[in-house]
From Swiss-Prot:
This is Leucyl/phenylalanyl-tRNA--protein transferase. SUPFAM superfamilies: Acyl-CoA N-acyltransferases (Nat). The keyword Acyltransferase applies. Its EC number is 2.3.2.6. Keywords: Acyltransferase, Cytoplasm, Transferase. It comes from Paraburkholderia phytofirmans (strain DSM 17436 / LMG 22146 / PsJN). The keyword Lipoprotein does not apply. One of its GO terms (biological process) is protein catabolic process. NCBIfam families: aat. Belongs to the L/F-transferase family.
Length: 245
């Protein structure tokens, strides 16, 4: 049975999450609140919220866990060509934390195959914006000719980045933001991005599944490290692909 958490109740051990044979593998708990303090505690334990509008807040810790190691990020030839153009042309920019809430709202509006609606409601935007205001959540944004055309957002503690969602209004704009993030994380020797659940898109970029036990061990060690700086631009792409000579 999935426990209901009151405002002061702690999360149960992640090992108590529902198993693979259940109707909701990885579901750990439910609650009626999405307070910033609850979010911070969740991420530092390797737990994340995901639910549909009208449901209680559902908290998850799946096994296995999808992750992307920056060192294993795959750059297809077509994307490599695009990244070189981004580096070369002044019309392209990568901005960090320029308009965090707007990136979240754009992610909420992005169409998702097999999904109706979004869990990124106004309350969710406000909760994550609270983390952003204290430096624990960040947006990486792709801009072209002064207009934001793609991006992603996530949560960061110490040497761990927890990816949440991304969007693209032009081809590969979200991949440009991800590549810049990967470059920045490589510079600071970050070993893992949490991707939560397996998708073919993430796998094509180098994502792979690891056991929950391995994931939680890495999170516990990484979140206690000193925070990294969160100011960079498109030159972070140089860590991923050298510009054309």
């Amino acid at each position: 049975m999935v426990p209901w958490l009151g405002p002061d109740d702690p999360f149960p051990p992640v090992e108590r999450a529902l198993g693979a044979t259940s109707g909701a593998p990885g579901l750990l708990a439910a609650s009626g609140d999405l307070l910033p303090s609850r979010l911070i505690d969740a991420y530092r334990r390797g737990i994340f919220p995901w639910y549909s509008d009208g449901q209680p807040v559902l908290w998850w810790s799946p096994d296995p866990r999808m992750v992307l190691r920056p060192a294993e990020f795959k750059v297809a030839p077509s994307l490599r060509k695009t990244l070189r153009r981004v580096l070369r042309e002044d019309a392209w920019e990568i901005r960090v934390d320029h308009d965090f809430a707007s990136v979240m709202r754009a992610c909420a509006q992005a169409p998702r195959r097999g999904q109706r609606g979004t869990w990124i409601t106004a309350d969710v935007v406000e909760a994550y914006s609270s983390l952003h205001r204290v430096g624990d959540a960040h947006s990486i944004e792709t801009w072209f000719e002064g207009k934001r055309v793609g991006g992603l957002y996530g949560v960061s503690f110490g040497k761990m980045f927890f990816g949440e969602s991304m969007f693209a209004e032009v081809t590969d704009a979200s991949k440009m933001a991800l590549a810049a993030l990967v470059g920045h994380l490589r510079r600071h020797e970050i070993e893992m991005i949490d991707c939560q659940q397996n998708t073919s898109h993430l796998a094509s970029l180098g994502g792979r599944e690891i056991t929950r036990k391995s994931f939680i061990a890495h999170v516990r060690a990484s979140v206690e490290a000193p925070p990294i700086p969160w100011r960079f631009d498109k030159t972070a792409l140089l860590e991923v692909v050298a510009p054309a000579s």
